[in-house]
Swiss-Prot record:
Full protein name: Flavin prenyltransferase UbiX
Pfam family, one: Flavoprotein
The keyword Transmembrane helix belongs to this UniProt entry's keyword annotation: no
HAMAP family from the UniProt entry: ubiX_pad
NCBIfam families found in the cross-reference section: PRK06029.1, ubiX_pad
Entry binding sites for FMN: 23-25, 49, 103-106, 138
Binding site for dimethylallyl phosphate: 168, 184
Enzyme Commission code(s) on record: 2.5.1.129
Length: 201
């Protein structure tokens, strides 16, 4: 059970956050992010790709949509280009967006202004409205093209976050490593939490 740091019973006032789950390996990162945000009382809008559904089935043996329905009533396929998140007014009234995991294809589309689906279009809206956008990249190694795309977005204020777990937390299991990545992504949106053990020197 995750609780907001510094509180016992108070849940954070409900705010809207968009979570994108692309077809990169590491679907569990997206699911865990949604779980934590749900516990913190956020209104969560989730955009998923067809590839993400396949990856979830392969890596976790689950139906991704059925799993996400436990935590949110707002689930969109990236082909639903007409859905509410495609409007820039939606991003203006949202706290932020995290694409976790973010595939290299999705990174490239966003970096080059290609809003061919709901996921990339929504991300572009967050950039043009100067709202917080976090891209959690899991791919390795990264070549010059991927790094240039990431640099282009970083210069625009987008947070580029590699899914690189820390070992100073002395993880006891894979959940500790997953929670560290998710917690770091939430940090970038300014969300208070106690999901992982912070470095104290």
């Amino acid at each position: 059970m995750v609780k907001e740091a510094g509180t016992k019973n108070r849940r954070e006032k409900t705010k809207r956050i968009i979570i994108g789950i692309s077809g990169a390996s590491g679907t569990i990162y997206g699911i865990r992010t949604v779980q934590f945000l749900n516990e913190l009382g956020y209104e969560i809008h989730i955009i998923i790709s067809k590839s993400a559904e396949k990856v979830a089935q392969k890596e976790l043996g689950i139906n991704l949509i059925n799993e996400l329905k436990k935590y949110s009533s707002y689930i969109y396929n990236q082909s639903q280009i007409e859905a509410s998140p495609s409007s820039s007014s939606f991003s203006i009234t949202s706290k932020g967006m995290i694409i976790i995991p973010c595939s290299i294809k999705t990174l490239a589309e966003i970096a080059n202004g290609i809003g061919s689906n709901l996921l990339s279009r929504t991300a572009l809206n967050f950039i043009r409205t100067n709202k917080r956008l976090v891209l959690v990249i899991r791919e390795t190694p990264l070549g010059a093209i991927e790094l240039e795309n990431a640099l282009k977005l970083a210069r625009l204020g987008v947070y580029i976050m590699p899914a690189s777990p820390a070992f100073y937390i002395l993880p006891k299991n894979i959940d500790d490593m997953i929670n560290f990545i998710v917690g770091k992504a939430l940090d970038l949106l300014g969300i208070k939490h106690d999901i992982y053990k912070r470095w104290k020197g």
